[in-house]
């Protein structure tokens, strides 16, 4: 199977600060020492992934819009929120919104709720692309900023998305080809691919 880098598979994370009215773009990337200590998280990892320090590992804890490593995702989100919103006060960061573009099941949604609570949110609101009453063609960024009108106490939002969805498509097709080969359906797979051309 074609090799994919953590940068290609990682989710893009956008953090919206409703107080300052600023949006920050991040990547779901982490670099850990093999002892378990996190070296860094987010965009800072991109340049380091190809020349990792000795005894360290780099990967994405959120892949294809889903949490693939809960503990690392929690540490990553804590660091990102602290970086952009400051250290949480005694009561935490207040109310947070999680906006996800992927279709998730209940268990996957709960993982995101738990992540935000563990990262310091006092309350968590969930939204996805099925939000009602949005005029067609409205950019998702405007929708997320506008959620403050519905949820007055929102302090921040975390959007899980993918700026280059073609990376996900390439990965999914490579996975499908690999599975078809394993299942003895390689010929059928190739036939279907030819039909699509």
Regions found by a protein language model. Give the residues of each.
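Nucleotide/phosphate-binding catalytic cleft detector across ATP-hydrolyzing
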Residues: 1-25, 32-37, 45-197
């Amino acid at each position: 199977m074609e090799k994919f880098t953590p940068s290609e598979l990682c989710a893009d994370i956008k953090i919206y600060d409703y107080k300052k009215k600023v949006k920050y773009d991040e990547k779901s990337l982490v670099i850990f020492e093999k002892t378990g200590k996190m070296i860094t998280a987010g965009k800072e990892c991109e340049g380091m992934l190809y020349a990792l320090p000795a005894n360290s590992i780099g990967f994405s804890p959120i892949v294809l819009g889903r949490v693939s490593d809960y503990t690392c995702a929690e540490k990553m989100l804590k660091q990102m929120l602290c970086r952009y919103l400051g250290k949480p006060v005694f009561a935490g960061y207040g109310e947070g919104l999680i906006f996800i573009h992927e279709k998730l099941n209940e268990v996957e949604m709960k993982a995101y709720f738990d992540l935000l609570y563990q990262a310091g949110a006092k309350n968590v609101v969930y939204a996805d692309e099925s939000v009602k009453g949005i005029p067609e063609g409205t950019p998702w960024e405007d929708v997320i900023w506008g959620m403050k009108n519905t949820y007055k106490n929102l302090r921040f939002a975390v959007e899980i998305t993918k700026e280059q969805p073609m990376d996900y498509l390439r990965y999914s097709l490579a996975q499908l080809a690999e599975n078809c080969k394993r299942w003895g359906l390689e010929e059928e797979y190739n036939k279907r691919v030819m039909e699509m051309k």
